[in-house]
Curated annotation (Swiss-Prot):
This is Periplasmic nitrate reductase. Component of the periplasmic nitrate reductase NapAB complex composed of NapA and NapB. One of its GO terms (biological process) is nitrate assimilation. NCBIfam families: NAPA (TIGR01706), PRK13532.1 (NF010055), TAT_signal_seq (TIGR01409). It catalyses: 2 Fe(II)-[cytochrome] + nitrate + 2 H(+) = 2 Fe(III)-[cytochrome] + nitrite + H2O. The gene is napA.
Length: 924
């Protein structure tokens, strides 16, 4: 057996043993004669594994890794092997459910009763129009998803922004990737990684920062393990985390740091380079391709800026007060000393509204900012394990810096939620690029800072499609008039249709519901009431306020339980779709089986709802706020050949171009397409009649229209048919060729086009006009271009707004486990995965357990200023926190940990920090 086969078999077996189960032989590739196999994509994380799925008698009967898939090469993790079983849980939603009273009328306090699709859409239309007519375009909201198919996300975006003229659509990817997006946009001027997974096999060094890859990206971790075992002496692995986890098992160095101090560690590495190893700097790379930059530090923490908000409990207020002002301790005052502050000073957050503003600084200013981050200071601030000596911790920091600095050593830095879910998440993303740029180790085979995506299409749908409240497809934004013009032309809607004011980000949609500013919300492909911090507020907002909540889901999760209307959604292999993964690889699949019960795809739900709105209801004059009124575009629409009585379905989704897509396309031969042709279930549609399909290839139309946004400016995608013939392609796809390393003129068509005589070109055009300044502020208003250059940011170390205290002495971090996906809505229905990990545990150190008089398995209360939950203690498990920190995963609705967490965010990205709040632990 060769090494790779050994790794593969060991990974499968270890994944199964972790879950406490044996892998069925059918899931390891045994093939039945009457099974029909086809390629598809795994439903779970952002790795983007290819799978083969088998269908028989109208059901998915087996899945296995796809040997032809370049991402996973035939291997799946334990969740991947159970893709089939997620679809057939006993409580699968099969009919719409509406809260009603005994008279059959909608009643917010009523019980759920089954209704027809027509009755469901009638009530949904009524409640939407009530909120829309009362509050306008800001009165409604859509909780979107990084698990939408690309076509679903595109349809939702188009309906919201071109149809309803609202920007209040935001994906749960705001919770997972928004800080990475800001890091990319601020640094490169364009989103998504420069490298690819091939870097793993080419690098000498893998350094993980807040990324427990062994459990969260296990297939990529198998490739890392393979690389490590291929050259034990040369290849080094370092795991940086706030607690010990399985990623440390093959690590040469494990660094346990105090929450938030990753900011200080990055600056220490940069200081080592600049002050002690200037010869390691790639001065030509820096001079030719980079500028130095910074921004304001006094930007708050993304909390409400009114601690006296009527919905706050008294216990919450002392934390929320820090949104406006903090008192500096010695450590934070040292890091901010360039601002002229000292310990004990009140530090006011004066620049909350311009958190993303940045300007160019000199190298000398950059060097000045790094001055405090000596080894002594950084070790004292960052050491996270009380059992480790300061000297040992210092040695590890030095070894870490040396690995980066070593001249010919290739280095890849990976990170995920430990970086992104962070009140300074955008900053710490920028810091990773800072170090790689200083050394010239970015956008090169085997070297680069690489943000790993959490969800299967957080890149492909949330980011590339632009289902964020401020975005449009292909990195365009609603605030840019040129971008709106491009979008309106592609969508064939009148000029000035699109609302130029960004909408509410995900968490703010919740706050708007609580404040009565939004009275209609539609949840699609996610579970916001379980996945949003400080959940007690949002449960009350859903159940006690005058609003109407619609949840499209496949199982009754917490969000469905607090909803007013539940719509049963088709699951992944019951529809056509596409996902985009973390290495920019786009992959498509075909519908394999019919949906269960009366479930229908989210695309169908979006299009059917669009039928209920005439242009005159939505394209009329609309007041956004006291400063902005959207003009009526009905006359312009008439000039384009539309009638004011046309529906949004007619104009946006069933137009002449759409109808040209042949429903009998050769690519679809032999496969169902419920949206296009209906199916044998004879579903009674939203009009009460049998739904027989749209009569045109709607998924192909949506894809081909969507790809127009990216063609010609670095976001090129291939045509629909091509993706069904390959195992994905990494964009930009130019002349049929994918791109492995962006910005490198040897590999990237657009880099070569931008700078034909150079080796690199950072050609993104976002925020490439800068003013000059120093570490404190910009010094002039005159802007200059930094075309084709990237930014090396200085960002200071700052602490979390809520930290352990005498009353709440523990840090709380949340996250995932290998066996379950997100809120557990799907994986908790798989018997094998449920038996393996039936509940979320509170992982804590044995020393803390002894101090509290706890035994293994005891039930405890985990309580913060916001709420409390019961959980069972695990002091001997896979995760080993240091003294003073506990880890509780969030997949278990019976351990509703987001009742405890703090809704603080990165002020730039608006991404919640789920990794840091203060709690007390006591026996239940």
């Amino acid at each position: 057996m060769n090494r790779r086969d050994f790794i593969k078999n060991t990974a499968i077996a270890s994944a199964a043993s972790v879950a406490g189960l044996s892998v069925p032989s059918s899931m390891l590739g045994a093939q039945e004669e009457d099974w029909k196999w086809d390629k598809a994509v795994c439903r779970f994380c952002g790795t983007g594994c290819g799978i083969m799925i088998a269908r028989k008698d109208g059901k998915i009967v087996a899945t296995k890794g796809d040997p032809a898939a370049p991402v996973n090469r035939g291997l799946n993790c334990i969740k991947g092997y159970f893709n089939a079983k997620i679809m057939y849980g006993e409580d699968r939603l099969v009919m719409p459910l509406l809260r009603m009273n005994e008279k059959g009328e909608f009643d917010k306090k009523g019980k759920f009763q089954q209704v027809s699709w027509q009755r469901a859409f009638d009530e949904m239309e009524k409640q939407f129009k009530k909120a829309y007519n009362e509050l306008g375009v800001t009165g409604i909201g859509i909780f979107g998803s990084g698990q939408y198919t690309i076509q679903e996300g595109y349809a939702a975006l188009k309906l919201a922004k071109a149809g309803f003229r609202t920007n209040n659509i935001d994906p749960n990817a705001r919770h997972c990737m928004a800080s990475a997006v800001v890091g990319f946009m601020q640094t490169f001027g364009v989103d998504e990684p420069s490298g690819c997974y091939d870097d793993i096999e080419l690098t000498d060094t893998i350094i993980t920062w807040g990324a427990n890859m062994a459990e969260m990206h296990p297939i990529l971790w198998s490739r890392v393990s393979d690389r490590k075992l291929s050259n034990l002496d040369k290849v080094k692995v370092v795991n940086l985390s706030t607690f010990s986890n399985r990623t440390s098992n093959i690590a040469d160095i494990e660094i346990i740091f105090k929450p938030n101090t990753d900011l200080a560690i990055w600056n220490y590495i940069a200081r080592e380079i600049v002050y002690n190893h200037p010869e390691a700097m790639d001065m030509k790379f820096i001079k030719d391709h980079c500028v130095f930059a910074t921004g304001y530090a006094d930007i708050g923490y993304g909390m409400r800026n009114n601690p006296n908000h009527p919905k706050f409990k008294e216990s919450e207020k002392d934390t929320v007060e820090k949104e406006n002002v903090i008192t500096l301790d010695d450590e934070e005052a040292t890091s901010l000393s360039y601002l002229g502050v000292k310990a004990g000073d009140k530090f006011e957050m004066k620049h909350q509204g311009v958190a993303d503003k940045n300007w160019e600084i000199s190298f000398d200013e950059f060097k000045k900012g790094l001055a405090p981050y000596t080894l002594e200071y950084t070790a004292r601030v960052a050491k996270g394990d009380d059992n480790e000596s300061l000297e040992d911790f210092k040695k590890k920091l030095q070894e870490l810096a040396n690995l980066y600095i070593e001249k010919n050593r290739k280095v890849v830095s990976f990170w995920t939620m430990g970086f992104n879910q962070h009140t300074r998440g955008s900053w710490v993303n920028e810091q990773a690029y800072m170090v790689h740029f200083l050394l010239g180790k970015q956008a090169k085979p085997g070297s680069g800072a690489f943000s790993l995506t959490g969800q299967p299409s957080a890149c492909g749908t949330a980011r590339e499609v632009g289902t964020f409240s401020h975005r449009l497809p292909a990195d365009m934004v609603v605030a840019n008039p040129k971008h709106r013009e491009i979008s309106e032309k592609i969508w064939k809607v009148p000029a000035k249709t699109i609302n130029p004011k960004p909408g509410s980000p995900y968490l703010n949609i919740m706050r708007d519901l609580e404040d009565g500013k939004i009275k209609f919300a539609w949840v699609q492909v996610n579970n916001p009431w379980q996945n949003t911090a400080n959940a007690n507020h949002w449960i009350a907002a859903a159940r006690e306020m005058d609003n109407f909540i619609v949840v499209s889901d496949c199982y009754p999760g917490i969000s469905a339980k607090v909803a007013d209307l539940i719509l049963p959604s088709a699951m992944i292999y019951e529809k056509w779709g596409a996902y985009g993964n973390a290495e920019r690889r786009t992959q498509h699949w075909k519908q394999q089986v019919l949906p269960v019960g009366a479930a229908m795809s989210d695309t169908w739900q979006i299009l059917e709802f669009a039928k209920r709105f005439k242009l005159k209801e939505v394209w009329k004059e609309q007041k956004v706020d006291n400063k902005l009124t959207l003009p009526s575009v009905l006359e312009e629409a008439k000039a384009m050949g539309y009638s004011e009585d046309d529906t949004l379905f007619d104009v946006l989704f069933a137009n002449k171009e759409a109808k040209s897509f042949n429903p009998n396309d050769a690519i679809a031969k032999g496969f169902d397409n419920t949206d296009v042709k209906g199916d044998e279930r004879k579903i009674q549609g939203s009009d009460g009649k049998e739904f027989t399909g749209y009569g045109f290839f709607v998924q192909k139309y949506l894809w081909e229209e969507y790809r127009k946004f990216g063609l010609g400016h670095g976001h090129d995608l291939a045509d629909f048919d091509t993706y069904h013939k390959v195992r994905g392609l990494r964009w930009p796809v130019v002349n049929g060729k994918e791109t492995q390393w962006r910005f490198n003129t040897k590999f990237d068509y657009y880099a070569k086009k931008a700078a034909p005589n150079s080796d690199f070109a950072f050609y993104g055009d976002f925020n490439k006009m800068l003013t000059n300044g120093d570490l404190i502020a910009p010094k002039d208003e005159k802007e200059h271009s930094i075309k084709n250059k990237a930014k090396i940011f200085f960002r200071p170390f700052m602490k979390a707004p809520e930290r352990p205290s005498k009353e709440y002495p523990f840090w709380l971090a949340t996250g995932r486990v290998l066996e379950h996906w997100h809120s557990g809505t799907m994986t908790m229905r798989v018997p094998e995965l449920y038996r393996a990990v039936p509940e979320a545990l509170c992982y804590m150190s044995e020393k803390d357990g002894e101090k509290l008089g706890l035994n293994q398995g005891d039930l405890v209360w985990v309580e913060s200023r916001r709420g409390k939950v019961k959980a069972r203690v695990d002091m001997r498990g896979r995760n080993k926190p240091p003294v003073g920190l506990v880890y509780v995963p969030w997949f278990d609705e019976n351990v509703y940990i987001n009742k405890v967490t703090l809704d603080a965010t990165c002020p730039l990205s608006k991404q919640t920090d789920f990794k840091k709040c203060a709690v007390k632990i006591y026996k239940a």
